[in-house]
Amino acid sequence: FSQHIIRLECKEYSGYIYCCMKNQNIQTQLQSLIYGAVIQEIEPEHLSRVYIPNAPDSIKAKINDLIMLSYDLRDESNALIDQAQALLVKELNLPPISEIKVDTLDKSKSVQTFNVKLSEMAGRADASYHMPIVDAIVDILKKNAAEVTTVGDERISKSVVLAGVFKRTYVEEEYGYPFLGGKEITQLNPKTEKFLSKAIHKSRYEKELKVTENTVLVTDRGTIGTVALVPKHWNNYAVSQNVLKLIPANNDIAGYIYVFLSSECGGILLRRQTYGSVVDMIDNHSLEMVEFPILKNQDIQKQINDLALQANEKRYQAYLLEQEALKVLDEEVIYAE
């Protein structure tokens, strides 16, 4: 773990301590201990000044068990994704990236050099677009898949939405849409502190920012290619214009899209589309051009898809358990009469 993460070693009821730390009242205490004008931080000794309620053991155990169950579901969700990834690799006969042989002019050199035909330039003069590893991966896909199409194929996606740049107007929670940035899309329960004005941004929200369950999200600048599958509890959230929204053709392909794009080979094909001299980015057209395999065995493709959707459902159930634990803490401890 990073040196910038404080680790609490709990003697018991670690789930209860975790739940307390997530509570808004205790978060306020933590925020009051922050110091630093440029880089804000807290120190381990500051935590000794944070008060948490000493609830009866029965309530501590109840909250602790809910949090532990929530984390068990997260582990099960991750295991399902690993299983789906393994099926994809096996069906496409994908070797580890380090074992894929690529054609370079002089293999003895540390810097790769390679030829590109003028007919294959595709309007791109940047070397990263033409890396030999990309052609090698595509060749493997063509050899082992029934067909290699692109993400923009209407059988794969309805559309890829790139929101325009706009000045954001934030309001209080009751007047706005919950707003997520690219950094939050990998979290189960992002800390939503920003709410876009419904009065000002309604039209843009409906057309470009709104997400629904099983939409595939892809970060399009900065750290390019982080992929997420929208869980049920993010329904109707607004997601930053720095995140592409891939609308699957249907739920029979949504999970499979997520598994492929988040795979090692899928990530290379996706990031290959990167352009920009100062700020690296991809856009909706770039994502639509990413090569995408349709498997020979449709039963395996369906199994991969179903595993991803099951994993997404488990993430939602994990979220509900955590919310229940937070509710118990509020109602039976902090605000108990």
Regions from the PLM with identified roles:
Residues 1-4, 36-58, 236-244, 275-300:
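A short glycine-rich beta-alpha junction/loop motif
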Residues 152-167, 183-213:
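Sequence-specific dsDNA recognition surfaces
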Residues 15, 212, 255-259, 264, ...:
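Feature representing long, continuous alpha-helical segments
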Residues 177-178, 215-217:
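Beta-sheet entry/capping signal
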Residues 1-2, 15, 28-32, 186-197, ...:
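Short, ligand-facing micro-motifs at secondary-structure edges
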Residues 8-9, 17-35, 51, 262-265:
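Well-ordered mid-protein domain cores that form the structural environment of catalytic cofactors
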Residues 56-166, 298-337:
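Non-catalytic DNA-recognition/assembly elements of restriction-modification systems
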Residues 13-18, 57-61, 251-257, 298-302:
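Short, conserved charged micro-motifs
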